[in-house]
Amino acid sequence: MSTDERRKQLGARIKALREQQGLPQRKLALMIGSNQTHIWQIENGTVNVGLDLLCRLADALEVNVRDLIDF
């Protein structure tokens, strides 16, 4: 699996979890100290997500990091 495919899978998983919780992109962005554009980029797999950001996303979505990257 390529890095691009992994980024897209990660983004899709984050988007699905966010939508399950009824969180708008803007609110998730505020929760992790980011902005809506960055959340859109993450969810569409166009940016790399570092460990610190991955941890903040997992905390905000109330899941374990492994739940985001289990692919």
Annotate the PLM regions.
Residues 1-9:
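A detector for short, charged/polar N-terminal pre-domain segments
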Residues 8, 19-20, 48:
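Short amphipathic helical patch at the helix-1/turn junction of helix-turn-helix
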Residues 12-31, 56, 61:
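Short basic helix-loop element that most often maps to the first helix and adjoining turn
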Residues 27, 38, 48, 67:
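Residues in the helix-turn-helix
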Residues 32-47:
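Recognition helix of helix-turn-helix/homeodomain-like DNA-binding domains
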Residues 46-56:
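Short, basic-rich loop-to-helix N-cap that marks the start of a DNA-contacting helix
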Residues 49-51, 62-71:
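Short C-terminal boundary/hinge segments that cap the last helix of small helical domains
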